[in-house]
């Protein structure tokens, strides 16, 4: 499954989610016990598979879609389902295109989608279902209650994973203060962060299908995962192995490698360590590492990112930063006496809180 195909499917599912005019029209067709074949988009590729019918070019409405579905033939909408372009057209895709569908309407929908790269919606009269075809993929729309049940289960799982992520992140912060961090400690946080992101993506897919009926879940989800992506990026900036002359490597490369790990590989901490630029060996997990200080500085209030970068660049590592006095901090460009005192006090409070959280 390509990323582009995944994005296109999400876009179409958002268009047919509860609360949209298109979903209202589809439900009217189902209740009326009639079938329908609806193409989203029109260009030269569609012209090649269309025969007959008549042009309309009128504004879309659920009632118009329902009435037009009573006629034989397919309905052509514009790509955003804002206009009804054609009705009662015959679709004649290439019959040699492979398809696993059996019904005439669904076979046609699948082949038109594959040939034209346009989404096609098939409403089945006999099975009373709505199937969406995008780039050779098929997705059957489900009742909101079923999707909501699965979304709630996934959200409960996400809450447990997020709680565990908070625990290991707090432990890592305390270890950073004491300067006793190992590669294993870093990889555990990265692993948990990636797990949270993946479940977040799964819940997001459910929310797309729920449309307006998923608003409360969306608020819970956004609150639950707030800051996770930023913390993941700061972790990579803190521990990414510097690039060698032979191999250019940046934070984005490391994050992409983490994102590309399979579910099985993500459980292997050595594979996670490789995303940070460490050798893919079990021995490296016990190697000591020193953070640069991005994670801790990001928790100091009212400190711009550009100042964070300058402070990290000046001191070169968290131990030297924690040992720095107010006068030392003032040597950094853009850090005056007031800001230096704020940074010094903020770091001291964070250090005390991190150690207390670990041992209390």
Where are these regions (language model features)?
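Divalent-cation
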Residues: 1-262
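Long, highly charged, low-complexity intrinsically disordered interaction regions
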Residues: 230-332, 337-360
């Amino acid at each position: 499954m390509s990323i582009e195909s995944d994005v296109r499917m999400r876009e179409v599912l958002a268009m047919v989610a509860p609360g949209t005019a298109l979903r209202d029209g589809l439900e009217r067709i189902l209740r009326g016990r009639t079938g329908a074949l609806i193409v989203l988009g029109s260009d030269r590729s569609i012209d090649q598979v269309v025969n007959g019918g008549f042009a309309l070019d009128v504004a879309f409405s659920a009632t118009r879609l329902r009435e037009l579905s009573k006629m034989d033939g397919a309905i052509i909408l514009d790509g955003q389902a804002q206009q009804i372009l054609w009705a009662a057209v015959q679709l004649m895709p290439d019959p040699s295109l492979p398809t696993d569908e059996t019904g005439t309407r669904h076979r046609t929908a699948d082949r038109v989608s594959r040939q034209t790269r346009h989404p096609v919606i098939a409403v089945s009269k006999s099975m009373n279902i709505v199937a969406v075809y995008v780039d050779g993929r098929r997705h059957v729309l489900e009742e909101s209650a079923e999707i909501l049940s699965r979304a709630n289960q996934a959200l409960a799982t996400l809450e447990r994973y997020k709680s565990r992520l908070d625990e290991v992140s707090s432990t890592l912060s305390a270890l950073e203060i004491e300067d006793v961090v190992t590669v294993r400690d870093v990889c555990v946080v990265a692993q948990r962060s990636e797990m949270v992101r993946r479940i977040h993506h799964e819940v997001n897919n459910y929310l797309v299908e729920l449309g307006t009926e998923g608003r409360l879940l969306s608020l819970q989800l956004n609150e639950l995962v707030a800051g996770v992506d930023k913390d993941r990026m700061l972790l990579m900036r803190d521990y990414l192995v510097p690039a060698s002359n032979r191999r250019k490597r940046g934070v984005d490369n490391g994050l992409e490698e983490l994102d590309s790990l399979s579910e099985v590989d993500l459980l292997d901490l050595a594979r996670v360590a490789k995303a940070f630029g460490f050798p893919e060996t079990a021995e490296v997990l016990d190697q000591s590492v020193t953070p640069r200080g991005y994670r801790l500085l990001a928790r100091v209030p009212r400190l711009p990112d550009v100042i964070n970068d300058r402070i990290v660049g000046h001191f070169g590592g968290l131990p030297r930063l924690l040992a720095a006095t107010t006068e030392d901090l003032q040597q950094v460009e853009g850090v005056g006496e007031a800001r230096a005192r704020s940074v010094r006090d903020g770091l001291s409070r964070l250090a005390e809180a991190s150690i207390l959280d670990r041992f209390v």
